């Protein structure tokens, strides 16, 4: 659906540039993302009023729009308002940073995006499998809304730096050469603040503590990086806030190990269970499951439980769980138990049930003795 640019800014069709700028400034500050975090409607309204201002502030585009409407702009290739950087660039004009000095000065004196922040969060192994929401307290610098990020007291504007004349660079003579260096007066800003804001002391930012909700999806692993847009440091001069990068660290588990979407575990079973076979309960990350152990199973044998592994972050279902048997040798036997085992061993000897073991050692001894001859 197309929008009427004049209605969007609530101005008449014959409004002058001062009226248009004032109307946009009022709406832009009202719907600015930093003031309406998480509000999708405000974000949409902010983009719409910015699109309208992009056209109406330019007399050439405005004439085309007044004559031919949106189709005229589209056919002339002038409706593209660019990315987020272009959207926020209009704030430079609104706050009095435009004009003179070329493109580099416009960038230097225009909106400044806030710094990105990093936060390391630790979660348990089971939280990484099931997903979890965490609330963390962040101490960060946010846009000072008293001065709207300019750093100057309300009613005042930064002044052109007298040392570099707004260029942000000064020339230094070194022998026969002249070297361009950052202006020490304005520190490369091109402007100096004569009347600093009482709240931010000229920084354009104030330090605040905020609680941020972090939703960690099921299936994350150590090193996973999540990006929360707009949750970094606040911007200056109408620039957007930076982003918050959350780095996940998953604790190890005493029973489960993970490799990709596959979970491994070592299941201790008794000697009789391994010899006779049985159906046992196996703990998985999704609950208790039955595992049928065939008679004669050996230590180190592996069994796969399909779909009992880690949920895929790409939505491809769960990985598998691999169970490795660990046959436990009984300890602390009484004399009667030892006698029973000796009798059992003798019975196996008589009936040739240890032939595999005998054959293995016989082959090994022959190989070793043969080499020593």
UniProtKB/Swiss-Prot annotation:
ZnF (CR-type) intervals: 131-209
InterPro entries (UniProt xref): DnaJ (IPR012724), DnaJ_C (IPR002939), DnaJ_domain (IPR001623), HSP40/DnaJ_pept-bd (IPR008971), HSP_DnaJ_Cys-rich_dom (IPR001305), HSP_DnaJ_Cys-rich_dom_sf (IPR036410), J_dom_sf (IPR036869)
SMART domains per record: DnaJ (SM00271)
Start-end of each CXXCXGXG motif repeat: 144-151, 161-168, 183-190, 197-204
Residues binding Zn(2+) 2, per UniProt: 161, 164, 183, 186
Swiss-Prot/TrEMBL keywords: Chaperone, Cytoplasm, DNA replication, Metal-binding, Repeat, Stress response, Zinc, Zinc-finger
Residues of the J domain: 4-69
NCBIfam families from the UniProt entry: DnaJ_bact (TIGR02349), PRK10767.1 (NF008035)
Protein name in the entry: Chaperone protein DnaJ
Gene field: dnaJ
């Amino acid at each position: 659906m197309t929008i009427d640019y004049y209605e969007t800014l609530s101005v008449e069709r014959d409004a002058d540039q001062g009226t248009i700028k004032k109307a946009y400034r009022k709406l832009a500050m009202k719907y600015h993302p930093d003031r309406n975090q998480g509000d999708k409607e405000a974000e949409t309204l902010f983009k719409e009023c910015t699109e309208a201002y992009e056209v109406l502030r330019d007399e050439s585009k405005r004439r085309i729009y007044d004559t031919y409407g949106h189709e005229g702009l589209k056919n002339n290739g002038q409706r593209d308002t660019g990315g987020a950087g272009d959207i926020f660039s209009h704030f430079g004009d609104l706050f009095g940073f435009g004009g003179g000095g070329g493109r580099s000065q416009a960038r230097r004196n225009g909106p400044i995006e806030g710094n990105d922040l990093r936060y390391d969060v630790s979660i348990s192994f089971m939280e990484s499998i099931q997903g979890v929401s965490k609330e963390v307290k962040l101490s960060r610098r946010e846009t000072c809304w008293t001065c709207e990020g300019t750093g100057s007291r309300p009613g005042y504007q930064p002044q052109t730096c007298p040392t570099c004349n707004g260029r942000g660079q000064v020339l230094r003579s070194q022998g026969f050469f002249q070297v361009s260096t950052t202006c020490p007066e304005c520190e490369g800003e091109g402007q100096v603040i004569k009347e600093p804001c009482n709240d931010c002391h000229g920084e354009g930012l104030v330090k605040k503590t905020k609680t941020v909700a972090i939703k960690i999806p099921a299936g994350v692993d150590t090193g996973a990086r999540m990006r929360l847009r707009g949750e970094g440091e606040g911007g200056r001069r109408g620039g957007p806030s930076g982003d918050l990068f959350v780095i996940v660290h998953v604790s190890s588990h005493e029973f489960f190990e993970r490799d990709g979407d596959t979970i491994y575990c070592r299941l201790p079973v008794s000697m009789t269970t391994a010899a006779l076979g049985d159906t046992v309960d196996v703990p998985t990350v999704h609950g208790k499951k039955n595992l049928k152990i065939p008679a004669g199973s050996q230590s180190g044998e592996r069994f796969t439980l399909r779909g009992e592994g880690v949920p895929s972050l790409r939505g491809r279902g769960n990985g598998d769980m691999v169970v490795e048997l660990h046959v436990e040798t009984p300890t602390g036997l009484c004399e009667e138990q030892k006698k029973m085992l000796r009798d059992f061993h003798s019975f196996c000897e008589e009936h040739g049930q240890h032939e595999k073991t005998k054959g293995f050692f016989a082959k090994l001894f022959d190989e070793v003795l043969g080499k020593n001859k």
